[in-house]
Amino acid sequence: MPSITLTAGPIARAKNGVIGKDGTLPWRLKTDLANFRAVTMGKPVIMGRKTWDSLPRKPLVGRTNIVLSRDGSFEPKGAVVCEEFGEAVSIAREQAEEDGAREVCVIGGASLFDLALAKAGRIYLTDIDADVEGDVTLTPLDETRWREVSARAYPAGEDDDYPFTIRVLERR
């Protein structure tokens, strides 16, 4: 049986490390959102409560949604709730195996990315070529621990506020 890879992301970050502002994404990048959907479709996704709350439509269709929350009364429709990251990863891996998926995606927020980066085998990272104002930042990534396996650059345009590069990194 193939192993199930834990991934950090897809995650988009500005040059200054910003990943969010006021509970939303501080940019409009339709091309990146399409990539997010393509990468996560059919795979379990793990997110924190604030990320869940920020979703315009809940749950994310076609994916098992797992939400971390310490609030015992939190019962989101269409999601599994876990109190601990390890428990969420175990449940997600079991679900991935059942679904025939080969990855589990940790999709946010910042503290969950920090937890995921310690164990992830792959990172789906969108680097936005701009400094953006925001109130949530990603811990700087030590890229010496990772090797880039793909990168594709996109220009700013009608559907995308800024130029950006979608990258895939794998642990060395």
Residue ranges of predicted features:
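Flexible, gly/pro- and Lys/Arg-enriched active-site loops
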Residues: 2-172
